[in-house]
Design a protein with these regions (language model features):
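Short, positively charged and aromatic/hydrophobic N-terminal segments
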Residues: 2-3, 9
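Intrinsic structural disorder
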Residues: 1-2, 41
Length: 148
């Protein structure tokens, strides 16, 4: 795998079979990371989950920092003094000759609504066939996991 701060040998393209093998090898760790994100009820629209939103941002910051990125949790303060929700910014040093890439994702989730309408715990990722279910698993936990 290629990690931030290291350039892969780009002198030749990866064959689709090599790429598939690498993705399959990485899948268990990616699934574990996604499972950890789904377990955090980071509902930003609900003040009762403010600590969970903070925990989500910090969890992701720690993961990026562990990969060698400079990662920070930032907040804006509104004119009325209200502190904003946490946003995470991470970057790696520029590699000469490599393009600049910007990746974006959000770490908060929508409320679950009526729990009686769920057939499972919304904050416990569940694999069914070739799909992963859980609040925020695709929007946007999968995006964050792929960034990691």
């Amino acid at each position: 795998m290629v990690y931030p701060g290291r350039m892969a040998d780009t002198s030749h393209a990866l064959s689709s079979s090599v790429l598939r093998e690498r993705l399959e090898a990485a899948f268990p760790s990616l699934l574990e990371e996604l499972t950890q994100l789904v377990a955090i009820p980071s509902v930003s629209s609900d003040p009762a989950h403010a600590a969970d939103v903070e925990r989500s941002a910090e969890h992701i910051r720690e993961r990026f920092a562990a990969l060698g990125l400079d990662a920070k949790v930032l907040r804006e303060t509104a004119a009325d003094g209200t502190e904003g929700k946490p946003a995470l910014v991470a970057h790696s040093p520029r590699i000469e000759g490599a393009p600049t890439v910007l990746l974006y994702a959000h770490h908060d989730v929508q409320p679950v609504g009526e729990l009686s309408r769920w057939s499972m715990d919304p904050y416990k990722a569940e694999v069914r066939g070739d799909r992963i279910y859980g609040r925020g698993s695709s929007d946007d936990g999968a995006g964050i996991t792929v960034h990691l």
